[in-house]
Amino acid sequence: MQARYSVSSPNSLGVVPYLSGEQSYYRAAAAAAAAGGGYTGMAAPMSMYSHPAHEQYQAGMARAYGPYTPQPQPKDMVKPPYSYIALITMAIQNAPDKKITLNGIYQFIMERFPFYRDNKQGWQNSIRHNLSLNECFVKVPRDDKKPGKGSYWTLDPDSYNMFENGSFLRRRRRFKKKDVSKDATKEDKERLLKEHNGSQSAAAQQQRQQQNQAQAEQDGSSQPVRIQDIKTENGTSSPPQSMSPALSAVPKIESPDSSSSMSSGSPHSIPSNRSMSLEAAESHHPHQQQHHHHSQGFSVDNIMTSLRGSPQGSGELPSPLISSSRTGIAPSLSLTYSPSQGSIYSPPCSQGSSSGGGAGTYHCNMQAMSLYSGDRSGHLTPANTPAATTVEETLPDYSITTTTSALSHGNQEHPHQGRLPSWYLNQTGDLGHLAGASYPGQQQNFHSVREMFESQRLGLNSSPVNGNSSCQMSFPPSQSLYRTSGAFVYDCSKF
């Protein structure tokens, strides 16, 4: 800006030079402003002008834009941030005896805070008012040992916690003696009430203990004899038995005739088959009795072991049971058992319980039992004896008696064989080796057994009594009705 406007003389700008005695004052002010930290960057270009008028403007601009520094007030003249109650409390607590006169309060405040050295009339009047109006300050009469003017002032003992955390800047609440008395009476009442309640609770507890002792003594005098206290001659406790040992050791055994006749609705049920030679079973197999006593259900293994282990027991079997076991009515038993009873049978042969079709599946132990019992009953009772006719009379719904006996004795002839398919007539001789063979519970010819059951099913379907028969068996769809080419050997341990 100065380069554009070259000033040759002050008259070209129309500025009249003002020369007076104040010119030296402005120069001094400008120098003071420059030395005092003003806008020195602006003063340097202005110094190009050598005319005193420019120096005058320069000093005015520098003083106008300079920092404003008012006259600082001394620290002693600042009013302290304490209330009059706080000032009086400071003076009392600073005294050696925790009590001080009114003149001593004045002297303490003026020595500590110089602000109160002036205008003594105003603040001293406020001090007197606060001493008389606040109940936290207590006036103590003067004794004769210390002569002087005025009484002592001290703090109330309950007012020491007026200020929070000992800071005189913050006061909790206005101290009132009535509140202190109310609090004291309230605390006394609560303390008395607690003591009264404690005495009452102690008395009630003592009375309850006495009642418990009296009741215990009464119970001890009239306590009945318990069953556990009754000792036998050996010193062991004997609980009462609801039934005799002979009855408790007898397992529940149902014959195939009774279950099949009940399921088919036939009135010809044989209740004598439920006994099933208990004397022979008790004398030869006590551990099996214990097992069946715990299971309380029908077990095919019991019949199997009774037929194998005790020939004299099998000789005592009634003829209807022998004939029915020979005729292979075991498939009808599967109609009366739910799948939840699959745990009765042995674990390796769990085909019947795992397939889910409880009404149409067969257990391998049952099949082996039926074949084995058929073989045993074959040489015990001939096929044409009255026992076979008894089964025919007892079970009118079954027309397959001589068909199965023809399977067991492969040389007999019967009119029902004419109704069977031609492929089955060629396979009747294959079952001849089953009579003398032993059947373990885990491996057998499963296809031969299945063909025997299929022949019974075909015989049932072709019999004239099949219209009203309730013993129809549903086979699982996984088993085909016709024999495929090749002999399949089923291992029950796989299932």
Swiss-Prot record:
UniProt xrefs under InterPro entries: Fork_head_dom, FOX_domain-containing, FOXC1/C2-like_FH, TF_fork_head_CS_1, TF_fork_head_CS_2, WH-like_DNA-bd_sf, WH_DNA-bd_sf
Q: Look up the record and give one Gene Ontology term from the biological process aspect.
A: cellular response to chemokine
Q: Which cell locations does it reside in?
A: Nucleus
Compositional bias (Basic and acidic residues): 178-197
Pfam families found in the cross-reference section: Forkhead
> Is Secreted among this UniProt entry's keywords?
no
| GO molecular function term, any single one | transcription cis-regulatory region binding
A cellular-component GO term for this protein: nucleus
Keywords from UniProt, A to Z, are: Developmental protein, DNA-binding, Nucleus, Transcription, Transcription regulation
Composition-biased stretches, type Basic residues, lie in 286-295
Recorded hits in Gene3D superfamilies, A to Z, give: Winged helix-like DNA-binding domain superfamily/Winged helix DNA-binding domain
Is DNA-binding included in the keywords of this UniProt record? yes
Residue ranges with Polar residues bias = 233-245, 297-313
Composition skew (Low complexity), residue ranges: 200-218, 256-275
- Locate the region Disordered: 175-326
- Principal subcellular localization: nucleus
Residues annotated as DNA-binding are: 79-173
The family database entries (SMART domains) matched by this protein are listed as: FH
Q: State how it assembles.
A: Monomer.
Its annotated function is as follows: DNA-binding transcriptional factor that plays a role in a broad range of cellular and developmental processes such as eye, bones, cardiovascular, kidney and skin development. Acts either as a transcriptional activator or repressor. Binds to the consensus binding site 5'-[G/C][A/T]AAA[T/C]AA[A/C]-3' in promoter of target genes. Upon DNA-binding, promotes DNA bending. Required for cell viability and resistance to oxidative stress in the eye. Promotes cell growth inhibition by stopping the cell cycle in the G1 phase through TGFB1-mediated signals.
Q: Please state what the protein is called.
A: Forkhead box protein C1-B
This protein's species is Xenopus laevis
